[in-house]
Amino acid sequence: MSRRMSLTALALLLAPAACSTYVEDRASEAWAPVYPVEEAERLDSLPTGGIYSSTSRGLFVSDRRAARVGDIVTVDFDEKFSASKSQSASGSRKSDYAIDLPDALTLGLDDGVLDNSTDQGFSGKGAASQSNSLRGRMSVSVTRVLPGGNLEIMGQKLLTLNNGNEYVRLKGVVRPEDIGPDNVVTSDRIAHAEIKYIGAGDTADTANAGWLRRGLSVVSPL
């Protein structure tokens, strides 16, 4: 019985070790590629011997930019943000007062003058700064053509390095005219962009505090 309890406790302790990998693997399911729906072969798509076909882009069409569900478009990441903030405040206050008391109250023991002074001061400063950058390229798929003609894109890239995984995920909306002739769009032209760079595995877990330490830090009064 005690051995079974020991094994159960060990399993509970080891379970969080693979938590990040499990969570990100499950999250990857929501970023699965979207493929165009295969429609039944229509009469107007059958070969007729003519050069022009309304269902094909043709051999002589030079514009190969993404335009339909399932098409691939390359995103050029050029993200760089920086922000800084500083604040300072100071204040001072000084007051003096004197009261001339009647001799009847002081019994003639002093000059009858009661004086006092206060001097207060405060000074505080604060500063904060943050910067980040992301550069690189990845290809994503068109998942939906919106009524206005804009394209909803989504995709992810998985990199496995040693004992860890790196996920690069992107979701957003682009205008067809913002896609260059080389079928590349820069990340700053993506509306409602959701860019994620997430690490999972042993390397990422070592950079985070364990679940026990996080729990103790919540309840600790120090």
UniProtKB/Swiss-Prot annotation:
Give the positions of lipid attachment, kind N-palmitoyl cysteine: 19
Question: What GO molecular function terms would the record report?
Answer: cytoskeletal motor activity
Where is a lipid covalently linked (S-diacylglycerol cysteine)? 19
Tell me where it resides.
Cell outer membrane; Bacterial flagellum basal body
> Which InterPro entries did the record assign?
Flag_Lring
| Pfam assignment, any one | FlgH
Keyword annotations: Bacterial flagellum, Cell outer membrane, Lipoprotein, Membrane, Palmitate, Signal
Membrane disposition: Lipid-anchor
Q: GO cellular component annotations, sorted alphabetically?
A: bacterial-type flagellum basal body, distal rod, L ring; cell outer membrane
Query: What does UniProt give as the signal peptide span?
Result: 1-18
Task: Set out the biological process GO terms recorded for this chain's protein.
Answer: bacterial-type flagellum-dependent cell motility
Tell me, what does this protein do in biology? Answer: Assembles around the rod to form the L-ring and probably protects the motor/basal body from shearing forces during rotation.
* Protein family per UniProt: Belongs to the FlgH family.
Its recorded name reads Flagellar L-ring protein
Source species of the chain: Cereibacter sphaeroides (Rhodobacter sphaeroides)
- Gene that this polypeptide is encoded by: flgH
